[in-house]
Design a protein with these regions (language model features):
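Conserved active-site motif detector
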Residues: 156-277
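Core RecA-like ATPase module of SF1/SF2 helicases and allied nucleic-acid translocases
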Residues: 1-147, 152, 156-169
């Protein structure tokens, strides 16, 4: 019952490649005739994007992108806007106001500060300089109080107001959510189904069968899990979990890094898988 926000990130892709942003940029490119975006065209493009992606759960992020650019630029140059979007990440537009709890990785919390910080750290990482820098970033997010929960001994020698040891064993959660990235889907599978993928929007429900995701209404295959993700799922299946549901998280533009410049981009579907036991 506690108001909570998750600071999401886009592992493996830029905010620039989000389908909602690509639609807005294409709308402008087809109609703008001067370096400055006319106010009427800017508002028209926003309305068209909001209408086309009315059911998308990513539109709040997109609208905050518009608002931030408007706040920073009274005169809207198309080149400035493209640079602004290209250099932005999803974390830049996550609104955590009004949330009593903010859930985030250390990397995504960089640049933010909180009254109280709870760090959950496992001991299965190599203790190198990079890890120490990451821990430092997490520790320095706290303005008042810092709580570190760990199964390792990295912090044993540090002075603290309180040390507690918990020897209890905890069962696995009844439900988990796996957020798929580019590494978790078979990218070549998306070639040839761009129209079908672009017909979907963030939040749309999908069907899962045999490591493949299908549209709920037409039962068309729109994503196939990678070998890496299939192994991950099998590990969870062995622990008694099953896939309860799947939903579209992002639709993004993608093409291989070594692809010729003239090769068209592919629309890639990234989903959230909810597992229960």
């Amino acid at each position: 019952g506690v108001p909570c926000k998750l600071i999401q990130s886009m592992d493996g892709f830029r905010f620039w490649n989000l389908s909602e942003m690509r639609y807005f940029l294409r709308y402008l490119d087809k109609r703008v005739t001067t370096p400055v975006i006319p106010g009427e065209l800017w508002e028209e493009a926003k309305r068209a994007t909001s209408k086309t992606y009315a059911r998308s759960q990513n539109m709040d992020l997109v609208k905050r992108c518009f608002e931030q650019f408007e706040h920073l630029n009274q005169t809207k140059y198309i080149s400035d806007f493209k640079e602004f979007v290209f250099e932005s990440s999803m974390e830049d537009f996550c609104d955590v106001s009004g949330s009593e709890v903010v859930v985030s990785t250390i990397h995504k919390a960089k640049g933010r500060e909180f009254d109280d910080v709870y760090m959950l750290l496992t001991d299965n990482y190599i203790k190198n300089a990079e890890l120490k820098r990451r821990y430092y970033v997490g520790i320095t997010r706290a303005k008042n109080r810092l709580f570190i929960h760990t199964n390792g001994h990295c912090f044993d020698r540090l002075t603290a107001d309180r040390h507690d040891r918990d020897d209890r064993s905890y069962t696995l959660p009844e439900e988990i959510v796996l957020q798929l990235s580019h590494r978790d889907v078979y990218l070549e599978f998306f070639k040839g189904i761009k129209r079908e993928v672009l017909a979907l929007q963030s939040g749309d429900r999908l069907q899962y069968r045999d490591f493949t995701l299908y549209t709920e209404k037409t039962d068309l295959p729109v994503a196939k899990l990678s070998v890496r993700m299939q192994k991950t799922l099998n590990d969870w299946f062995a622990k008694g979990y099953r896939v309860k549901s799947a939903t579209v998280s992002f639709i993004v533009a993608w093409k291989p890094k070594d692809a010729p410049k003239e090769e068209p981009e592919t629309a890639v579907l990234l989903a959230d898988l909810t597992l229960t036991r």
